[in-house]
Structures are given as structure tokens and as C-alpha cells.
């Protein structure tokens, strides 16, 4: 599971600087690190579901 997560993080970091994605306008350039991290955020909710179920003993 950790390998999949690290692979996704690595891929999002590599492809975020790719020519396939557009650059942010200069006015929003300070938000660039947040925008690079945003594709990974849904995975945290997915992992949170497993942590929550483990906390309640998978009822």
C-alpha cells in the first residue's frame, strides 16, 4: 500500500512540471506548491476510511 502511495506521489510530482499541464498565471504563482499537492488529497480521504474502520474494529 505504501508503495502505491509513494508511486502516486512521485508521479504527481513528476507530471506537475510537464508540458501537458498549463502554468498558473503570475498572480497565482505563490499557490503553485499547493496546486502541485492537490491531486494527492483524495487519497488521504481513502486512507482515512481504513484508519477509521481500524479504530472501530471493522464493524
Swiss-Prot record:
Transmembrane regions listed in the UniProt entry: 30-50
GO terms under biological process: photosynthesis
InterPro entries: PSII_PsbK, PSII_PsbK_sf
Pfam families for this protein: PsbK (PF02533)
The entry's keywords: Chloroplast, Membrane, Photosynthesis, Photosystem II, Plastid, Reaction center, Thylakoid, Transmembrane, Transmembrane helix
Record's function text: One of the components of the core complex of photosystem II (PSII). PSII is a light-driven water:plastoquinone oxidoreductase that uses light energy to abstract electrons from H(2)O, generating O(2) and a proton gradient subsequently used for ATP formation. It consists of a core antenna complex that captures photons, and an electron transfer chain that converts photonic excitation into a charge separation. May be involved in PSII dimerization.
Subunit structure: PSII is composed of 1 copy each of membrane proteins PsbA, PsbB, PsbC, PsbD, PsbE, PsbF, PsbH, PsbI, PsbJ, PsbK, PsbL, PsbM, PsbT, PsbX, PsbY, PsbZ, Psb30/Ycf12, at least 3 peripheral proteins of the oxygen-evolving complex and a large number of cofactors. It forms dimeric complexes. This protein, PsbL and plastoquinone-9 are found in PSII dimers but not seen in PSII monomers.
Name recorded for this polypeptide: Photosystem II reaction center protein K
Lineage: Eukaryota, Viridiplantae, Streptophyta, Embryophyta, Tracheophyta
Amino acid at each position: 500500500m505504501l508503495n502505491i502511495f509513494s508511486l502516486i506521489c512521485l508521479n504527481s510530482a513528476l507530471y506537475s512540471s510537464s508540458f501537458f499541464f498549463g502554468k498558473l498565471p503570475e498572480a497565482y504563482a505563490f499557490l503553485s506548491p499547493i496546486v502541485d499537492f492537490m491531486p494527492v488529497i483524495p487519497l488521504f480521504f481513502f486512507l482515512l476510511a481504513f484508519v477509521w474502520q481500524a479504530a472501530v474494529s471493522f464493524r
